[in-house]
Design a protein with these regions (language model features):
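Charge-rich, acidic-biased intrinsically disordered regions
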Residues: 103, 131-136, 155-168, 272-283, ...
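Surface-exposed loop-to-helix/strand elements on domain peripheries
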Residues: 105, 127, 306-425
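Extended, charged amphipathic alpha-helical segments
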Residues: 220-365
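N-terminal-proximal low-complexity accessory segments that begin disordered
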Residues: 1-100
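Structured, mid-chain assembly/scaffold modules that mediate subunit interfaces
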Residues: 77-229, 435
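Short coil/turn segments at secondary-structure boundaries
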Residues: 131, 154-156, 254-259, 351-356, ...
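Short coil/loop linkers at secondary-structure junctions
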Residues: 96, 347-348, 402, 441, ...
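Charged substrate- and nucleic-acid-binding regions of tRNA-handling and nucleotidyl-transfer enzymes
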Residues: 422-453
Length: 453
């Protein structure tokens, strides 16, 4: 006898339903998802985008940095485009000079004179005896554009005065036997907050000296709190620069080859190689035997000139080779690559590579943007120059060559650059004089902006 299965039904009253949690009373719904709504997150929309880490401190290791420096130095030595861009980046900025701004005006005058007397002499200011204040800034800016950074060690001379010793980026290394577990990364030791506490300076292959951070300056562009070292201005332009150099090299080789050949002798189709019938061994018809050719050519000197007349066999012709490379498409492509290089530096391509393409209105706008770019670069440089300025004046006061300042804030200083770039000094000068006359502008500031230091 089969037992019947009982069916149980769950019956709940309205009161029971009211006592249940509110979430159970609601119908179930899927969590909202974009499902590819953000186009930049679609992995199949483009080719492979290789970026293996999101840790800022690990974006570049020692190998990557060395590879970028080698490529950038190669381009600087062998590419006129890159060499000119690096030099123009410095020339557009120019050097900056200090003006003491303490409340002790007499001390300001003496401090400026003592500072300039010290830094104007390479023998007294630079350990190697090669760099003065202005040439030091030019060297540091060019090295930073190529290598990404450099190290300035604050030193003391035999007379007790302030000196500096500069070292290029490859000299900044991690001491042997130390690594990230010891706080070292790419030649810099940082504390738990990411603040540099020491630098590793290579003195000989396999030997390293540890320099306290208080005695050194890591001169770099766009300092990032999460990134230990600076990046080259050319880091985005490495492949573009190599491509331009290769295109120029191949084009030059083709032009030289075509110039070496010059002419090509041609012959009609009837005189070319035998056809398929002869190739497969067919017999020639009677009466169709080929006559032997006389390939000899005679050259005759034309009387009254140096030209030569070439005598060719019947049916032969000479054609000159004219090389049409680079084509307009290749020239336009190279121009696009140059624009990529300029944009990566932060400048308009017309400023670095094609200033003649600017009109008057566009030139004023680009010069205004250029001034902002120069100010941004100078803001970073002033931080480093402030430390050198304080180092020199502090040792001058300690040595007794400069009296003590009556103002406790003896470190106050203003920095003035070279004169501003302009294409219409007359119009801007007239406007400035009207503003000064009405008390809306400062005459000293305008003079420094137009004349510089």
């Amino acid at each position: 006898m089969k037992r019947r299965k009982r069916k149980y039904k769950l019956r709940m009253s309205r009161a029971d339903l009211g006592s249940m949690p509110e979430a159970l009373n609601q119908p179930r719904a899927l969590n909202p998802q974009m499902l590819g709504g953000v186009q930049g997150a679609l992995p199949w929309a483009n080719g492979m985008l290789y970026w293996p880490t999101l840790d800022d401190a690990s974006e570049m290791d020692d190998y990557d940095r060395a590879a970028v420096m080698r490529a950038a130095r190669y381009l600087y030595k062998n590419s006129g485009v890159i060499r000119g861009a690096v030099r123009d980046i410095w020339l557009l900025q120019g050097c900056i000079m200090p003006i003491p701004t303490t409340q002790d005006r007499e001390w300001n005058r003496k401090a400026r004179a003592a500072f300039l007397a010290r830094v104007a002499s390479p023998a007294a200011f630079d350990v190697t005896g090669k760099l003065s204040w202005k040439t030091m800034q030019a060297w540091a800016e060019r090295k930073t554009s190529i290598d990404g950074d450099c190290l300035c060690v604050l030193a003391r001379g035999l007379d007790g005065g302030g000196m500096v010793a500069w070292y290029s980026a490859p000299k900044i290394v991690t001491p042997p036997g130390l690594g990230k577990e010891d706080g070292w990364n790419q030649g810099i030791k940082t504390n738990a907050q990411g603040r540099p506490v020491a630098y590793g300076l290579e003195t000989a292959p396999g030997r390293c000296m540890i320099i306290p951070a208080a005695s050194a300056i890591l001169y770099q562009r766009d300092p990032d709190p999460a990134v230990p070292r600076g990046e080259s201005d050319l880091i985005h332009a490495i492949r573009h620069g190599v491509d331009i150099a290769e295109i120029h090299g191949f084009t030059k080789a083709s032009v030289k080859l075509s110039a070496a050949v010059g002419f090509v002798e041609t012959k009609p189709d009837a005189d070319k190689a035998p056809g398929m019938a002869v190739a497969i061994g067919a017999k020639k018809k009677s009466g169709c035997e080929e006559k032997p050719e006389n390939p000899a050519q005679s050259f005759e000197i034309v009387t009254g000139g140096g030209a030569r007349v070439v005598s060719l066999a019947p049916g032969r012709d000479l054609k000159a080779i004219y090389d049409q490379r680079p084509s307009p498409n290749v020239a336009a492509f190279i121009k696009d690559l140059l624009a990529e290089i300029a944009y990566g530096v932060g400048l308009a391509p017309e400023v670095l590579f094609d200033i003649n393409a600017l009109g008057s209105a566009a030139a004023r706008l680009i010069l205004a943007k250029l001034k902002r770019w120069i100010d941004e670069r100078k803001d970073t440089r002033e931080v480093y120059m402030n430390r050198i300025y304080r180092h020199v004046l502090a040792l001058e006061m300690e040595a007794g060559r400069l009296p003590r300042c009556k103002d406790p804030a003896w470190e106050n200083v203003a920095w003035v650059g070279q004169r501003d770039l302009t294409i219409d000094l007359g119009r801007e000068g007239g406007l400035a004089m009207n503003l000064i006359r009405e008390g809306l502008a400062d005459a000293d500031r305008w003079t420094l902006a137009t004349e510089g230091m």
